[in-house]
Amino acid sequence: MENELYDVTIVGGGPAGLYTAFYSGMRDLKTKIIEYSSQLGGRMLIYPEKMIWDVGGVTPILGGQLIKQLVEQAQTFDPTIILNQKVEGLEKQPDGTFILTSSTGEKHFSKTVILAVGYGVLTMQKLEIEGADRYEVTNLHYTVQELEIFRNKHVLISGGGNSAVDWANELEPIAASVTIVHRREDFGGHEKNVLRMKESSVCVKTPFEVVQLHSDGDLIQFVSIMNKETNEIERVEVDAVIVNHGLKCDYGALEEWGLHIKDGVALVNEKRETNIEGIYGAGDFIDHPSKVRLIAGAFTDGILALNSAKLLIEPDAPKVAYVSSHNIRFKERNEKIGLQDNDYREVRG
């Protein structure tokens, strides 16, 4: 419906945004999610095969499976989901509501806005070697979507962060060989994982960097790596090359909205309120004194931001939602799966 006004519009469809959408349904708010990419999931789409250990009550789970479950949960109360739109413009109206304008020119109308944009639009740092892009359709990879495609292959990984170290550890049992190349002696990954890698069969080459790719047609067959201290060149035979040199983050026009942004993150208070009334933040995009940079912390951010939005819209509403075991919004759903429980709270929460 044109010019339809929503209670809350969540910008960003990663873990923070998805859980916030679910909780918004618990609080009986008309909700919209706007996501710039073609899929929900945010940064976790980059590592669907990595194990996630730090979500409370959830046994170790693949990133891709956690995304699937978060998306399913987010859709519990049927929020409106908009994909392939990057929010570029924000205009606050005299009545306190907002008009959000996307890259397509479409306008979205909302009483409140929750920014769960993570680190903005993310793009992989590419290998800075002329002609490298021609191999991206064959055996040059910037993420690992499926471990199995590397089984029994000779794999070279370039990078020294968490993802590079994790991929080395995960591929080591199934690949024919794994070589990791890092331009520094020290790795930026978690200490325990770096130690595990160094004690395994992974060949660690430091301080080296990739300087040339050698191919026969469209497949990389050898990689030349150079010692940063001696300029010595070595050649490594490969079946696949994985590059993890970090991510480029782009917030676009969002940085021009007048938010207090410091060191690439928006500053919020304990209620997850920004300096603009009616705009809140959740997840990696924000910082505050008690910030926890875990997926579980992003969920808490979303809850607190949503509660603040609820109270701005309905000042007399309960400060928090009733737990799902006693929330009237789950009564019908529980009955559908054969559960009967009369202890529900008949209130708007």
UniProtKB/Swiss-Prot annotation:
It holds the Pfam family Pyr_redox_2. Keywords: FAD, Flavoprotein, NADP, Oxidoreductase. HAMAP family: FENR2. Signal peptide: none annotated. SUPFAM superfamilies: FAD/NAD(P)-binding domain (SSF51905). Homodimer. Its EC number is 1.18.1.2. FAD binds at residues 35, 47, 87, 122, 284, 325. GO terms for molecular function: ferredoxin-NADP+ reductase activity; flavin adenine dinucleotide binding; NADP binding. Gene3D superfamilies: FAD/NAD(P)-binding domain. The keyword Nucleotide-binding does not apply. Binds 1 FAD per subunit. This is Ferredoxin--NADP reductase 2. It catalyses: 2 reduced [2Fe-2S]-[ferredoxin] + NADP(+) + H(+) = 2 oxidized [2Fe-2S]-[ferredoxin] + NADPH. InterPro entries: FAD/NAD-bd_sf, FAD/NAD-binding_dom, Fd--NADP_Rdtase_type_2, Ferredoxin-NADP_redctase_2. Its cofactor is FAD. The keyword Cell wall biogenesis/degradation does not apply. Disulfide bonds: none annotated. Belongs to the ferredoxin--NADP reductase type 2 family.
